[in-house]
């Protein structure tokens, strides 16, 4: 099974968000042990760095990004995704982008 993991699922684990960490950790673990083929959007990486840099040292942030990109494949962001997301008229453009990327990779 192939899934595109939302940025917030990654942040739930890294930031230990009490209400979501258990479920998000399961998704992370399934991807880590290759029970699920996990992908993240290229857009997720700078967003994760932006959040983590407020809490962690640059070195720790770099280590976590390396770990994330070893576990999850990164889906590039294409101009077709940008256009398709804009046409979705979603209230959350970032979510619309991720839906377009997921559709493109058949996740």
Short names for language-model regions:
Residues 1-40, 53-63:
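Short, well-structured N-terminal submotif of metal-dependent ribonuclease cores
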Residues 7, 42, 79, 95-99:
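Conserved glycosyltransferase catalytic-site signature
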Residues 16, 43-44, 64-89:
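Acidic catalytic patch
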Residues 35-38, 71-73, 106-107:
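Short active-site oxyanion
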Residues 93-107:
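Acidic, metal-associated active-site segment
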């Amino acid at each position: 099974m192939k899934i595109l993991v939302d940025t917030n699922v990654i942040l739930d684990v890294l930031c230990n968000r009490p209400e979501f960490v258990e479920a998000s950790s399961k998704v992370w673990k399934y991807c880590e042990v290759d029970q699920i083929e996990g992908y993240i959007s290229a857009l997720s990486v700078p967003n994760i760095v932006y959040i983590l840099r407020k809490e962690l040292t640059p070195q720790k942030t770099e280590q976590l990004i390396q770990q994330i990109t070893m576990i999850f494949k990164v889906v590039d962001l294409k101009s077709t995704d940008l256009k398709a997301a804009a046409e979705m008229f979603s209230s959350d453009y970032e979510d619309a982008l991720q839906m377009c990327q997921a559709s493109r990779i058949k996740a």
